[in-house]
């Protein structure tokens, strides 16, 4: 929450909170893992062969690793606002997987236009202050 807009999240404070939580996050992220598992199940219905997948709000990387397993030929880009979350994500990846890690904001993706083939996001959008901007960014990079 910011002073100028009580409904807008302060990204600096959000980043700090996730930086602090990163080392113990997996111990309590049961809902996130269950929702992620269900999202991945739904991908069975999607017939697509992506070359590059963006995991937007990747957290500790469980979704990124599962995407790399499912789409063996694809590169997976794990993006999170908190560097410490990405440090944890690196620990989950398999050494032979084509995973990359980028610290960035979903509302201002540090990616080129039309650079990804799929966007995956698990319980991250509630941390965004401007959903219209988020979906504009997703559309831009797809």
Labelled PLM ranges:
Residues 117-132:
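A short SAM/SAH-binding and catalytic strip from SAM-dependent methyltransferases
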Residues 52-109, 133:
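Class I SAM-dependent methyltransferase SAM/SAH-binding core
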Residues 107-118:
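A short acidic, Gly/Pro-enriched loop at the edge of an enzyme's catalytic core
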Residues 132-142:
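A short glycine-rich, Lys/Arg-flanked "PGG" loop and its adjoining helix->strand segment in the class I
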Residues 1-24:
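N-terminal, positively charged/glycine-rich alpha-helical extensions of SAM-dependent methyltransferases
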Residues 31-50, 66:
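Conserved alpha-helix/loop element of class I SAM-dependent methyltransferases that forms part
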């Amino acid at each position: 929450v910011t002073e100028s807009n009580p409904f807008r999240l302060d990204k600096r404070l959000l980043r700090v909170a996730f930086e602090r939580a990163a080392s113990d996050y997996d111990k309590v992220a049961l809902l996130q893992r269950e929702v992620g598992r269900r999202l991945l199940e739904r991908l069975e219905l999607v017939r697509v062969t992506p070359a590059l997948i963006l995991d937007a709000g990747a957290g500790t990387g469980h979704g990124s690793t599962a995407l790399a397993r499912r789409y063996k030929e694809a590169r997976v880009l794990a993006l999170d606002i908190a560097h410490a979350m990405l440090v944890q994500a690196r620990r989950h990846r398999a050494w032979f997987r084509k995973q990359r890690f980028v610290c960035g904001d979903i509302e201002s993706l540090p990616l080129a236009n039309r650079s990804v083939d799929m966007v995956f996001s698990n319980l991250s959008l509630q941390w965004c202050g401007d959903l219209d901007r988020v979906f504009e960014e997703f559309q831009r990079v797809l």
